Amino acid sequence: MEEFLSTLRDHDASSVLSSCEPELQELMRQIDIMMGHKRHEWEAEVRAMELSLHNTQEELQSAKALLDKRNSEIRVLGKQLEELHTGKQELVVKYEEQLLHVKEELSKLKRSYEKLQRKHLKESRDGALSREEDRTELSRLNSKIEEFRQRSAEWEQQRLQYQRQVSLLEEQRKTLAEQFSLIQSQGVGRPQEQGQGELQRLRSQLQRAQDSLHAQELELERLRLLQDELGDSIKEQQVSCHAAAHRRGQVLSEEREELKATLDAQDQFVRSTGVQQQQLRREVNRLNQTLQAKEQVIRSLEECLSSPGSAPNLASLRQDLEKVTARLNSSQTCESHLKAEVMRLRDKLESMRKYKAEMSRREHEWKQMEEEHSRCTAENKRLRDELERAEQTRCGEQEGMRKEVFQLTSELHQRDITIATLTGSTSSIERQLRAEVERAERRASELKVTQVQLETLKLENQHLNDLLERVESQSPKRGDGELASLRDSYVSSLKSLEEENRQLRLEMTELRARMEASNQTWQDKYERALLQNQNKNHLYNEQNRADEDVQRRHQEELQAMETQMQERASHYEEQIQTLLTQLENLSRTSPYRPDGQTQESKTSVSPARSSASSASSSSSTRKAQRVATLLSAVANGEEAQASSSDSTGSPNTSVTTRFLEEETLRSQELLQRLDAHIQSMKLENSNTVCKYLGKTGNPQNDVFWQGTHSFCKMID
């Protein structure tokens, strides 16, 4: 333009056209003034545009920084989501292990229930009281089994629900990761409002995921008694969420204020650009009018030049016309430039209008975010109330479970105590049973000795009967009355001894039958005592003391019996010695004693003594020997009385009859005491087995069974 103006000035200096020079100078002056004004305006617009460009660049940088901050927050939230997911998987694994443990306990309870059911079938033959107790126990176990089944079904449903929730959380995590990758890939090129909307949507999804995770935690902690810790963590997370939401609200309010300020500035800029556009339009109209006037002037000049007399100046006028056309072309190019600038300004105005609409949309979204925040606060309050109610229910269930666990631990402790006491008592019971078995063996040996004595008595009675028959055959007319009385006494004593022997055998058979019956009933009593041992633990020490007293009393009675038997044996020996001396005196004074009878008596005494001496291995055998010698002495005395009845007379017969009566009475008393002692032994053995041996589940019953079998064998 300056070159054009300089050319115009040079041309004005050298121009010869005097008529067009002032108009051209005026035109050039106006053009210079207009161009100066336009230059100043354009420079101001350029400065304003640069300032707005700088502001938009700063806003873009702040938006990028905010987007980076949101991306970092999204990464942190993704990490938190992964940590929560791993924690929930661990909790699910733990609860699955607990469910397996509960299933194992349920199987154990089922096995114990089956055992108790079998025991109940065995004990169905018992009384009504035991049946009622078993029914109550079975009903309690059935209720427990049904309760455990219901709990196992609930735990299985909860486990399936947790697995479904974990799968849903895994899908949500994958979708969030994909969205996060898309945001990272497209976050730089997107506008700021879209990034914020996507970020808000992701936050809402993350918040919903966190709410679902919190609900899962509440449900899981209700089962695992860890609600306190998770409640604290939930409260802390809610506080942090509220604080983060408050901070985000403050940041968004500040951004809204900044956007309002930028919108106001842009509105002012748009208004100023509109005013400038109107001024440019007016200026273009004015230039068009001047151009039309100049065209008219040029046409008039051409007409003047076409007239005659203007030929010399035609070349110069043509040159001036070319210059003017060049100027007009330059002005047209300048006008085109101005139009392009106007179009650019219009485009910028349109972009500013779009930006204003976007700002209004953002403001609307901000209002929606505020409404969503208020709704979230209400939802948080509702969730807090539900959490408090769930915590109250959890506390109640926890208290019930604590009571149940305390009851179970007390029962287990009581069971351990009973097991320890029973295991401690088994050794003492075993010792007592061994002592009882030894005592039974000793008494069986004594019974054998008594049987041997009875056999010897039978032999002696038979021998005496033979002697009496021979004496009667030799002297049928002597002392028929005395011999008849002696024979009757011996027959009666023999019958009594046979009757006693038969009674002993019957008692042995009855004892064997009772032992077999007790063997059959002891197993049932043992199984019933297993169920009743818990109620009888406090009576254990008293029963032990009572049994010890009974045993001590029996030992004292045995010792007294032994001392009494020893005293009687000594008394019998003294009487036997006196009788022997009397018989010797009678034999010396008797002239009718045959030698064959003495030899037979000696031979009859010698087998009795030999049979008695064969059993001299213990004190009982010694007693048998004494009784055998006593009976042989009685036989000698009777033979001596039978042979010397004529010489001695009635005093000797009265002594022998009195002695035989005393001996029969004492033998009957001894047998009765032996029978009573055997009965007391049987009662003691049965009571001991029913009280103690049936309480233990150990294989120590074999000791008693072996003892009873050996006792039966010895009796046989």
From Swiss-Prot:
Q: Which GO terms describe its cellular component?
A: centriole; centrosome; cytoplasm; spindle pole
**A GO term (biological process) for this protein?**
cell division
Question: Which residue intervals are annotated with compositional bias (Low complexity) in the record?
Answer: 601-622
Its chief place of residence is cytoplasm
Where located? Cytoplasm, Cytoskeleton, Microtubule organizing center, Centrosome, Centriole; Cytoplasm, Cytoskeleton, Microtubule organizing center, Centrosome
Q: Which UniProt keywords apply?
A: Cell cycle, Cell division, Coiled coil, Cytoplasm, Cytoskeleton, DNA damage, Mitosis
Q: Where is this region: Disordered?
A: 587-626
Which residue windows does the record flag with biased composition (Polar residues)?
587-600
Q: Which InterPro entries match?
A: Cep63/Deup1_N
- Coiled-coil spans in chain: 38-394, 426-590
Q: What does this protein do?
A: Required for normal spindle assembly. Plays a key role in mother-centriole-dependent centriole duplication. Plays a role in DNA damage response. Following DNA damage, such as double-strand breaks (DSBs), is removed from centrosomes; this leads to the inactivation of spindle assembly and delay in mitotic progression.
Which protein family is it in?
Belongs to the CEP63 family.
The protein in question is named Centrosomal protein of 63 kDa
Species name for this entry? Danio rerio
- Protein's gene: cep63
